[in-house]
Regions:
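Beta-strand-rich receptor-binding modules of extracellular spikes/adhesins
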Residues: 1-14
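Glycine-anchored, exposed beta-strand/edge motif detector
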Residues: 16-161
Length: 161
């Protein structure tokens, strides 16, 4: 109740709904998260995938970078706060994230994709699906506001030939 954490040593049964909240406040998030080690410096809102070294990297659809997605290594979520290389980073696996500075102005209701390339050195979800031969297409979520997304990765990854 005071913002701390509670540990349940056994199975937890919830008989009511779990509410995820949307917030207009910059940097707010709610949902399912996990802590990983960053394989490079990451910024809030960037899409990530797990590399073979077990660390998370910027996920790109171009198939050539450390975090390049493919059918065996899809993007898993979005970073909720900036993180230095080789540090703990919180990844939103499913839920809502608001970010004014790093997100472009999204079209409400639009499907969002793993980006084909970084924009202004950021790897944030894009409105346009990748379209070049050798790229991979993966839905990462949906725009629910001009600067708020619902992260809900679809683990289906399609290669453009």
């Amino acid at each position: 109740a005071d913002g701390g954490s509670t540990t349940f040593p056994q199975q937890l049964t919830i008989t009511k709904n779990i509410a995820l909240t949307q917030s207009d406040s910059d940097g707010d998030y709610s949902g399912v998260t996990a802590v990983f080690t960053s394989g490079e410096a990451l910024e809030a809102g960037e899409v990530v995938s797990i590399h073979t070294d077990g660390e998370v990297y910027k996920a790109l659809a171009d198939g050539t970078t450390s975090g390049a997605i493919n059918a065996d290594q899809p993007a898993i979520g979005v970073v909720v706060a900036d993180a230095a290389d080789d540090s703990d980073v919180i990844v939103l696996l499913q839920g809502f994230l608001t970010h004014n500075a790093n997100f472009p102005t999204y079209t409400v209701g639009a499907t969002l994709y793993v980006p084909e390339a970084e924009t202004s050195s950021k790897c944030v979800p894009e409105l346009d699906a990748p379209d070049s031969s050798g790229d991979f297409i993966q839905v990462i979520g949906y725009a629910v506001h001009a600067n708020r997304i619902f992260v809900n990765p679809d683990f289906t990854v399609i290669e453009i030939t």
